[in-house]
A protein has these predicted regions:
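Nucleotide-sugar donor-binding loop of glycosyltransferases
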Residues: 11, 70, 166-168
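Residue-level marker of alpha-helix boundaries and capping positions
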Residues: 46, 73-74, 130
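Histidine/acidic residue-rich metal-binding segments in metalloenzymes
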Residues: 1-65, 77-93
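Short, charged, surface-exposed secondary-structure boundary motifs
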Residues: 75-80, 104-106
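Conserved small/polar residues in nucleotide/adenosyl-binding loops
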Residues: 172-174
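Short, acidic/turn-prone active-site loops that include or flank metal/cofactor-
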Residues: 13, 70-74, 99-101
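His/Asp/Glu-enriched, well-ordered alpha-helical/loop segment
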Residues: 35-42, 84-168
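Short beta->alpha connector loops
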Residues: 48-52, 72, 148-149
Length: 175
């Protein structure tokens, strides 16, 4: 398009959404949006739970990232995002909370725990998504998903938002 900006969209969150799009267009939501040229300048998907192989190929080719929202997807019974598959295919994954209407707790530590825990159960593999990958999803990849390119490391001249974590709190002691 004339604006040459990335497009970000809630997409492929529920099976029903994907089925209805296939019925109306003959394509998945990702394929349909791609056919309209919406991903010519990159962008991202929020949720990305129900995809087929062609969807992954489009995302990889068009440099589309995904923001997974595990607590929201659990609350709304949307499904579990294929995070391990995204990582294996080299598609950047960030972690989000979706919002208070679909997630009762906007706690990123909870989201991080859910990302890794759900993938372990789905793949029956305690190392399905390593902790280092989850930390990257919650930090650097979040910045990437928002189009921020000057906050990937702690260094002079780079931007940074920092938090302090009380390691004496029981729930944070595993940090």
């Amino acid at each position: 398009g004339k604006y040459k900006k990335p497009v970000y969209v809630h997409c492929s969150e529920t099976k029903r959404e994907v089925e209805e799009c296939r019925e109306k267009t003959g394509m998945t939501p990702i394929a349909y949006m791609d056919s309209l040229g919406l991903f010519e300048n990159g962008g991202g998907l929020f949720h990305g739970v129900h995809l087929d192989e062609a969807d992954f190929d489009i995302m990889k080719k068009k440099k589309i990232c995904v923001v997974t929202n595990p607590a929201s997807n659990l609350k709304l019974a949307s499904g579990i995002a294929p995070v391990k598959t995204y990582l294996e295919k080299g598609i950047p994954v960030a972690i989000g909370t979706d919002g208070p209407a679909s997630n009762n707790c906007l706690d990123m530590f909870k989201e991080m725990f859910l990302v890794t825990g759900l993938q372990k159960v789905v793949h029956n593999d305690p190392e399905a998504v390593p902790a280092a990958d989850v930390l990257k999803m919650a930090t650097v990849n979040g910045a990437y998903a928002m189009g921020l390119d000057n906050c990937d490391i702690l260094a002079e001249g780079k931007y940074a938002d920092l938090i302090m974590i009380d390691l004496m709190q029981d729930r944070k002691s595993v940090v």
